[in-house]
């Protein structure tokens, strides 16, 4: 671990992102549970959970980011998660929520890049966040596909077919 003299604001910003990655995992787990338990989309739930929910705490995001923070001399602190007991009315509500969550997370990463880009000694942090933004762009696109497919299948009265076809329009 290197000893950098990051300001408390930079440390907070970095740890807020770490917390956001874990929050995203929790939110995605809740979506997977809703798909599986009462929205009757067990196949979609399994695929979504394995291909989307699992990336947030992994070495793609949270674990990787915490390692970067340690290497840069910032002690990682995972903040509290916000609970969500919401029950979704249908698959459209699920994937609207998912899209909103991922778009907001990408915006947070882009804002962090903008803030850190002007700070000395933050080059490594910025480069890592730029890679996150690149990955997030693909995930936003995937979320938009799911959202549009959910609308189409629900409007056609074919939620059962959405579950069957989910893997076909999952490109991640």
Please name every model-derived segment.
Residues 1-172:
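Iron-associated oxidoreductase/ferritin-like identity signal
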């Amino acid at each position: 671990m290197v000893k950098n003299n990051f300001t408390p604001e930079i440390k907070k910003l970095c740890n807020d992102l770490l917390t956001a990655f874990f929050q995203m995992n929790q939110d995605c787990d809740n979506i997977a549970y809703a798909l599986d338990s009462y929205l009757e989309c067990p196949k979609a739930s399994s695929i979504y959970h394995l291909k989307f929910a699992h990336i947030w705490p992994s070495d793609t995001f949270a674990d990787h980011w915490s390692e970067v923070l340690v290497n840069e001399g910032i002690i990682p602190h995972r903040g509290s998660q916000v609970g969500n007991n919401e029950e979704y009315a249908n698959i459209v509500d699920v994937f609207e929520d998912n899209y909103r969550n991922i778009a907001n997370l990408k915006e947070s990463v882009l804002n962090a890049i903008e803030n850190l880009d002007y700070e000395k000694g933050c080059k490594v942090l910025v480069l890592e966040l730029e890679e996150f933004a690149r990955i997030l762009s693909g995930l936003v696109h995937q979320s938009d596909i799911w959202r549009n497919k959910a609308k189409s299948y629900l409007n056609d009265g074919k939620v059962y077919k959405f579950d069957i076809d989910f893997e076909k329009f999952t490109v991640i």
